[in-house]
Amino acid sequence: MSDPFKGGQPDEGPGHMNIHEYQAKKLFKEAGVAVLNGLHCRDVEGAVAAYRKLGSGVVAVKSQIHAGGRGKGTLVDPVTREKIMDGGVKIALNEDDVRNFATNILGNVIVTNQTGDDGKLVNNLYVEAGCDIAHEYYLAVLVDRA
């Protein structure tokens, strides 16, 4: 993988980082940060294989695009713009759920508050092992560029 800290697209300045969740979690893991087990996949059979390999029973099937709000987004057909389903992050309880969610996510467009009405085509999934959540915390960081 190329260095994500050196920028990617020509219009991105030095230090810009634009990577998917699965790539970020790989970097965290390599740096010794504890992350849930997960696998990147690009097709439905890959998602089912990831579910089997993770062996956790419950998994999150996550669309991978460069925008936030995936969980609250709406998936639409890229041609007709007909609604496919709500949410680009789904909790799967079994293999059939994984297959269904992967089929509905991959190859379709997800529209979120950050993508605007055009949305973004989903070509990548991250299948992540589930866990029991006793407490949930959120962290936000604001960079003051002034």
Short names for language-model regions:
Residues 10:
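Cationic, low-complexity basic patches in intrinsically disordered or flexible, solvent-exposed regions
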